């Protein structure tokens, strides 16, 4: 009887690994420093650095309807209730299956309660609990 070729029997050779790291979370934004050999050629900017002058200027204060200057948006927006946390997470992570649960939580709980112990990051639109 002949054996049928199965891809599961194939073994990878130990020396045939790719030189490109497969951990995209190891970047300058994550705070985890990758080894020097991953950062590119010495003297050249790494792949995580942007060209100088490419960043947007900081947002300036906007004039409001009553003439006073309104400061730019703060880094975090407060969230009124934990039910809104579920709503924000579902919208951010694109989980429509959890959306009815979030709406039900919002109906069952009194949304006029005091502020919760977390804040919503406007950039990521994800719930971030406050450090205790």
Swiss-Prot record:
Expressed exclusively in heart. Transmembrane segments: none annotated. InterPro entries: DUF4620. Residues 17-75 are annotated as: Disordered. Keywords: Cytoplasm. It holds the Pfam family DUF4620. Disulfide bonds: none annotated. It is found in: Cytoplasm. The keyword Acyltransferase does not apply. One of its GO terms (cellular component) is cytoplasm. Signal peptide: none annotated. This is Uncharacterized protein C11orf21. It comes from Homo sapiens.
């Amino acid at each position: 009887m002949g054996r049928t070729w199965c891809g599961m029997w194939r073994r990878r050779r130990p020396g045939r690994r790719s030189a490109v790291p497969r951990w995209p979370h190891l970047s300058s934004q994550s705070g985890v420093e990758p080894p020097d050999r991953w950062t590119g050629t010495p003297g050249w900017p790494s792949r995580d650095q942007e060209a100088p002058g490419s960043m947007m200027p900081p947002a300036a204060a906007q004039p409001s309807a009553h003439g006073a200057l309104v400061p730019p948006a703060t880094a975090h927006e407060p969230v009124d209730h934990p039910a809104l946390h579920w709503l924000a997470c579902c919208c951010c992570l694109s989980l429509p299956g959890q959306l009815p649960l979030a709406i039900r939580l919002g109906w069952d709980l009194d949304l006029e309660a005091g502020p919760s112990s977390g804040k919503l990051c406007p950039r990521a639109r994800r719930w971030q609990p406050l450090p205790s």
